[in-house]
């Protein structure tokens, strides 16, 4: 798919997250994000029980001359929540967007490496992007429902994939799926914990919902195409605390049936909802990847400890 | 090309209805020609084409065409279209010439409104595994529709009152008493394109040319008729505006929750 849309590379391309601390204290070297610390492979190696859903090997991404992601390898277990944390500009969103090939839409981006979904290479030249994105859904940072009714937002994906037929032609041929559509809309909205709030106004425009409701609608829209993996790019960063906690509950609920990969700026959020956490630090480097408890209680890397205790970033 | 003497001197105009029908058909035909072409070109230029020298060149050419004097479009019609459309001035030639005049504005405004559709919609749709063309059809174009219609309204306002090119390509039937029967003129034929319409290839009256002929060129004896025709022309244009604004309101309502 060759997109001509000139999407600006995400803010992650700008390395603005690092703050070199100008101080005379002897610990200045270690409190800054850029210490001389060498990343060890065993920090990034995470042993887990259960099946691997996504397997990433030696992934590099360049935006023009900017090396946004450096040699990242990690395996993501099935039916769990994997949090990606790190300061802005560390490449975590870039990494997330590689998992469903959304970076293909950025012209300047060059991607090298391998991403396998259940053993199938997604960067295969013959890979079917439509199938891939049906299996790996995505929820964006700011809620982006279509300017259509709530019902149309949910059924948009299945209709475009031909799973639901509606309209004049379908009616003429007696293959109108209005009933199935109704069931799908109800099921998806219930999964996204939005049904109670909108069941009486499904034909209203989705832009009339609050930000938190819009974001849950986007999650429902993503669930309607029945994905296996859900990628979330800071889904709660534009929302108030109550809406955020609803999204967090939802993520935990979803992890029973789906593999969730979530990028977040909020470390408490990562600690609350995720099973394992990957820490990216400045320069597009994966520094540590382990059980969330291990990362937050006893990280191997000094820089990761500094980051999660708030010394920089 | 057979240039007819424009007005048979001394003849009385055959009423105003043929002119009203002529103008309505001209505008409808021009819109049917220019809108699909203009919107299609805008989609290609904004969504598919590499942004570069080619698109810049098209943009300059479009702007230049939009400010080209209408008589030049008329001459293009007389010299290029008419010989290819049976050799006589005709309603179809008039429609095409007005369509070519409408095309640049439709293209410019469609491009602007397609560019204004937020990329978030395109991202959201792509992330659902929907192809680019389906996204354009179901998300981008509906969101751009009000802007496209605004362009068509502006353009129709210009072409409905256009006189100079019509003098050259529409032909003179000031004294016609019957309006062109476009709908009744369709008939099936045995060879491709299997459909023909003789009414489109006949000359027709139109409101602006009739105003010009009666008031400025001094054809016929009653100037009142010219003023009345001018008034009717205004009404017809306002009716087109009303249709356009209603359509735009409908599409805006669909997009907004207010």
Swiss-Prot record, chain A:
GO cellular component: plasma membrane
Keywords: ATP-binding, Cell membrane, Membrane, Nucleotide-binding, Phosphate transport, Translocase, Transport
PROSITE patterns according to UniProt: ABC_TRANSPORTER_1, ABC_TRANSPORTER_2, PSTB
CDD domains: ABC_PstB_phosphate_transporter (cd03260)
Annotated segments matching region Disordered: 1-40
GO terms, molecular function: ATP binding; ATP hydrolysis activity; ATPase-coupled phosphate ion transmembrane transporter activity
Database matches in SMART domains: AAA
Residue sites binding ATP per the record: 86-93
Residues annotated as domain ABC transporter: 54-308
UniProt EC number: 7.3.2.1
Cysteine disulfide links: none
InterPro entries: AAA+_ATPase (IPR003593), ABC_transporter-like_ATP-bd (IPR003439), ABC_transporter-like_CS (IPR017871), P-loop_NTPase (IPR027417), PstB-like (IPR005670)
Catalyses which reaction(s): phosphate(out) + ATP + H2O = ADP + 2 phosphate(in) + H(+)
Location within or outside the cell: Cell membrane
Biased composition (Polar residues): 1-33
SUPFAM superfamilies per record: P-loop containing nucleoside triphosphate hydrolases
Topology in membrane: Peripheral membrane protein
Family: Belongs to the ABC transporter superfamily. Phosphate importer (TC 3.A.1.7) family.
Subunit structure as annotated in this protein's UniProt entry: The complex is composed of two ATP-binding proteins (PstB), two transmembrane proteins (PstC and PstA) and a solute-binding protein (PstS).
Described function: Part of the ABC transporter complex PstSACB involved in phosphate import. Responsible for energy coupling to the transport system.
Protein's recorded name: Phosphate import ATP-binding protein PstB 2
Organism, scientific name: Haloarcula marismortui (strain ATCC 43049 / DSM 3752 / JCM 8966 / VKM B-1809)
Source organism phylogeny: Archaea, Methanobacteriati, Methanobacteriota, Stenosarchaea group, Halobacteria
Encoding gene per record: pstB2
